[in-house]
């Protein structure tokens, strides 16, 4: 039976390994903030379980359609009633902007309407890979 001490020790070991990897990446000049490559198939599954209540790839719903979102200026898809903040934004959807948006939409475009976030970096990377695949990228 696993004890609390064993679990805590395992967690410390994982954290230590993560710090070692991050330190090595910095020493080699690799930015730690670089997004990991996502899994588009897992992203599709996540999209269908988390995003589909408000979004669709092909049609506007509560939120805008996502077909072609990657590489597009925020607030520019036809037929959707974006908030004034999103319409006025200069944001173009790419890896970094989508990652920040999914983590905390309000921090990217204050005054936007989306009230949902994706806290896990791996989930965001997978969703971005899926959205990218649906944009011909």
Model-predicted segments: where are they?
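Solvent-exposed, acidic/flexible segments
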Residues: 40, 44, 59, 91, ...
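N-terminal signal peptide c-region/cleavage motif recognized by signal peptidases
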Residues: 29-32
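Short Fe-S-cluster ligation motifs
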Residues: 79-99
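Bacterial N-terminal signal peptides that target proteins for export
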Residues: 3-20
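Short glycine/threonine-rich turn/loop motifs
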Residues: 40, 64-84
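Cleavable N-terminal signal peptides
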Residues: 23-24, 34-35
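Sequence/structural segment immediately N-terminal to covalent heme-attachment motifs in c-type
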Residues: 38-61, 66
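C-terminal capping alpha-helices of c-type cytochrome domains
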Residues: 94-137
């Amino acid at each position: 039976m696993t004890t609390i001490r064993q679990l805590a020790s395992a967690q410390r070991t994982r954290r230590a390994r993560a710090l070692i990897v991050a330190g090595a990446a910095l020493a080699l000049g690799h930015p730690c903030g670089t997004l990991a490559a996502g899994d588009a198939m897992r992203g599709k599954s996540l999209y269908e379980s988390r995003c589909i209540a408000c979004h669709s790839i092909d049609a506007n719903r509560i939120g805008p359609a996502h077909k072609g979102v990657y590489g597009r200026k925020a607030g520019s898809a036809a037929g959707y009633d974006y908030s004034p903040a999103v319409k006025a934004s200069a944001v173009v959807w790419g890896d970094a902007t989508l990652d920040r948006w999914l983590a905390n939409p309000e921090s990217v475009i204050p005054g936007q309407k989306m009230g949902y976030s994706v806290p896990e970096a791996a989930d965001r990377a997978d969703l971005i890979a899926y959205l990218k695949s649906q944009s011909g990228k």
